[in-house]
Structures are given as structure tokens and as C-alpha cells.
Amino acid sequence: MNSFFIKIMLFLVISHVSCSKSETDCCNKTEINTDNNIQQKAKVKIMPLGASRVQGARPNYESYRYELWKLLEESQYPFDFIGTQKDFANYPIADFDKDHEGRGGWTSSQINNNIDTWISQTGVPDIVLFSAPGGNDILTHQPYRQVLENIHSIIDKIQKHNPKVIIVLEKMAPGHSSFNTPNRKALFDVIHSDVEKIAQEQTTETSKVVVVDMANGFEDAFLADVLHYNSIGAKFVAQRYYHILTSFLEKE
């Protein structure tokens, strides 16, 4: 009788230990799964780089940045606009990311002379949206050979900071037809062709330089003045950037 009782007690003790271990393992697995579920993708750092078409000047004319931000947010891409400049204009959505690297009137020489400093201050970008390269140079009659050298140098410096950077290089949208003299149009046609060459020459095994065509399909009705976007133009440009970016971004 005593032997039978002892066996029963041993069975109950072993069963209790086994159940406790199973519950502990189950809890541990739940905690691991919970940790995995809350992990988020790192935000891709995007630098909008250029002059007044990047900067914007609400309410006089628009930048594409707000419309692009909305498209990326709505699609739930993890991203962060970066830059040393802040946009202090009012926008319908208060938490719009206003960081950028656009300075009205700046030439490729000025950007080339400052890009290293900006990156050291704002952090290294994963993607750079290089708006209207050479646009202000043409308008201010800078030597064209120097313009091309500056664009190459800007890209070289960005790639030195991040050998895996993606650079989106614009074929810039034209100015108003009343503003485009035959000479200006010829120069813009040349730089459009050279932008394609620059992208090919600057692409490396790890860093892609891709072209986005803002010129084809762009109309006078998209401009607030002879050079800058109105809201329609900003949406047009943002949509083209968005289409390119979806090839490189992953959703959360």
C-alpha cells in the first residue's frame, strides 16, 4: 500500500515539472514572436538636392517634396527626408517632413563646394534626388565644360560618403515656352543628352545613378511663373520621382 502511494506521488511531481517546463517554453516562444513582430525596417534616408525647385516658396510656387512625401507616406514606405535646410511654409498636413537640401539660385559650383559639409552635418543619404543639375548654370551662362565637371564631382563626393548610394538624376522640366529662347532650348537639349551619359559613366557595381525624365510631357500649365512649379507641376514631378523610388524602396 505504501509503495503504491509513493509511485502515485512521484507521477504527480514529474507531471507538474513537465507541465511547468512546457508553459515556460511556450511563454518564451511567445516573447520571441512578439519581439519579431515589433521589428521595423530602418528608414531610408532621402536627400532632395538642388536649387529653387527643391526649396519651393509657398505660396508663390511649389516644391515637389510635399506631394512626393504624401505618395510615399500613403504607400507606407519607411523613409526620412534629410538635409540642412528647413521649409517653414504652411502645409495642410502638419507632420510633413520639411528637411531638404535646396537653395534658390545656387549653381553646380556652389553645390559642389558644399556637398561634403552638408552630408557631414545631416548624415549620409541612401538616396539622393538630384534636381535640375546644371539648370542655374545655363541661366547664368557658366562655362558648360565646368558644369559637367561639377556634376561629376558632386556625384563622386556623394558616392565617396556612401559607395552604395542611389542617385536619381533629373532630365529637368523645361521653363515656360515664352522663356525658352532657341539658344536656351538648344542648351537644355544638350544637357538632357549629357545627363544620360553621366548616369552611365557614374554608375558603379554598388551605386546606381538613374535618370528620371521630367521633360517629356511637361507643359506650360504646370508652371507658376517662367521656371517654377505650380501645384499641378509639383504633382507631375512628384509622381515621376515616386515611380522611380518604388523600384528601390520596401514597404513596412
Predicted regions and their residues:
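Sec-dependent signal peptide recognition
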Residues: 2-10
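Histidine-centered active-site loop/cap adjacent to the catalytic His
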Residues: 46-49, 111, 225-252
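Loop/turn elements at helix/coil->beta-strand transitions in domains of secreted/extracellular proteins
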Residues: 42-45, 75-80, 123-129, 161-168, ...
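Active-site-proximal beta-strand/loop segments in catalytic clefts of secreted hydrolases
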Residues: 49-53, 82-87, 130-135, 170-175, ...
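Bacterial Sec-dependent N-terminal signal peptides
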Residues: 16-43, 251-252
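Conserved SGNH/GDSL esterase-like catalytic core that processes O-acyl groups on lipids
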Residues: 53-149, 189
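Substrate-gating cap/lid alpha-helix
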Residues: 174-213, 231-235
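Active-site segments of SGNH/GDSL-like serine hydrolases
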Residues: 131-136, 155-190, 213-215
